[in-house]
From Swiss-Prot:
This is D-erythrose-4-phosphate dehydrogenase. It comes from Pectobacterium atrosepticum (strain SCRI 1043 / ATCC BAA-672) (Erwinia carotovora subsp. atroseptica). One of its GO terms (cellular component) is cytoplasm. It catalyses: D-erythrose 4-phosphate + NAD(+) + H2O = 4-phospho-D-erythronate + NADH + 2 H(+). SUPFAM superfamilies: Glyceraldehyde-3-phosphate dehydrogenase-like, C-terminal domain, NAD(P)-binding Rossmann-fold domains. The gene is epd.
């Protein structure tokens, strides 16, 4: 049975989800019946077709009034501010993928359900009272039919959690720190402008900018055993896509670089195939643009100090990889039944 979805919010993630659906060949399984976005229909179609990070969309895109056509598929375009007014019941929507970045509470999810959707998947961590927070490949098998309001966590959580799991299962993590080296985002100005975070008043293209991150909370939401044992910081850098994560963990078992890389490489081809990738090529961030994996381990950067302190570097396309996981989680939610 085809899963009928609606996308609420057609920004970076919303558009990536739609493109990934068509480019990954999953169109036969999932149908987009509607997109809700306050921007103009013309602007929505234009930014779907032409993208500064991901290039031109290979499918034919047309827009007529409030209808978007992708190939032979027609998608209804909505411009509704209030969730409760969205026609999810009329459109027989199975799952709403809320990619707005604005909504993420249980109350927001219940508003989608009241409008007629059967389930809701948020594209960011959301509040802690949701039915489930999923990092696909790690805990998606714990989804149940009663989980109606779900979070897909964050792009950085999806990147680092599989690697943490692999290292913990093999070597026993005591504690760790994470530094996210993240591409600039749309909450940063092109030139200096006012923002409540004074660092984010500064031009995105001119500085490396420290910003707040909730990644440590994201880690402990998935792995509560690490409460008070992981800390994270984040900096934004002047690139428009792809993120690197510097992970340092102390482990109980004595270990060397070859053992770590062998584990991560084997897992990329077996238990985490399609989720984690591994490379020892001399690559840079641009080479991981449009990569569908949640995480790509750079084996050339693995280090060990004193046999118990591990440092790894993990790449991800923070848009494209996450968009593909949104689709994976959508399928997993549907497989549990409605």
């Amino acid at each position: 049975m085809t899963i009928r979805i609606a996308i609420n919010g057609f920004g970076r993630i919303g558009r990536s989800v739609l493109r990934a659906l068509y480019e990954s060949g999953r169109r036969a399984e999932i149908t987009v019946v509607a997109i809700n976005e306050l921007a103009s229909a013309e602007g929505m179609a234009h930014l779907l077709k032409y993208d500064s990070s991901h290039g031109r969309f290979s499918w034919d895109v047309r827009q007529e009034c409030d209808q978007l056509y992708v190939g032979d598929d027609d998608i209804r375009l909505l411009h509704q501010v209030e969730i409760q007014q969205l026609p999810w019941r009329e459109l027989s929507v199975d799952i709403v993928l809320d990619c707005s970045g604005v909504y993420g509470s249980r109350e927001d999810g219940e508003a989608h359900l009241a409008a007629g959707a059967k389930k809701v998947l948020f594209s960011h961590p959301g509040t802690t009272d949701l039915d489930a927070t999923v990092v696909f490949g790690v805990n998606h098998d714990r989804l149940e039919s009663g989980h109606r309001i779900v979070s897909n966590a964050s792009c950085t959580t999806n990147c680092i959690i599989p690697v943490i799991k692999l290292l913990d299962d093999a070597f026993g993590i005591e504690n760790g720190t994470v530094t996210t080296i993240h591409s600039s985002m749309n909450d940063q100005p092109v030139i200096d402008a006012y923002h409540h975070d004074l660092r984010r008043t500064r031009a995105a293209s001119q500085s490396i900018i420290p910003v707040d991150t909730k990644l440590s909370a994201g880690i402990t939401r998935i792995f509560p055993q690490f409460v008070d044992r992981f800390e994270a910081i984040s900096v934004r850098v002047p690139t428009i896509n792809v993120t690197a994560i510097d992970l340092s963990v102390s482990v109980r078992k004595a270990v060397n670089v070859n053992e770590i890389n062998a584990l991560l490489q084997k897992s990329a081809h077996e238990s985490f195939r399609g989720i984690v990738d591994y490379t020892e090529l001399p690559l840079v961030s641009a080479d991981f643009n449009h990569d569908p994996h949640s995480a790509i381990v750079d084996g050339t950067q693995t280090r060990v100090s004193g046999q118990h302190l591990i440092k790894t570097l993990v790449w991800c396309d923070n848009e494209w990889g996450f968009a593909n996981r949104m689709l994976d989680t959508t399928r997993a939610m549907a497989a549990c039944g409605f």
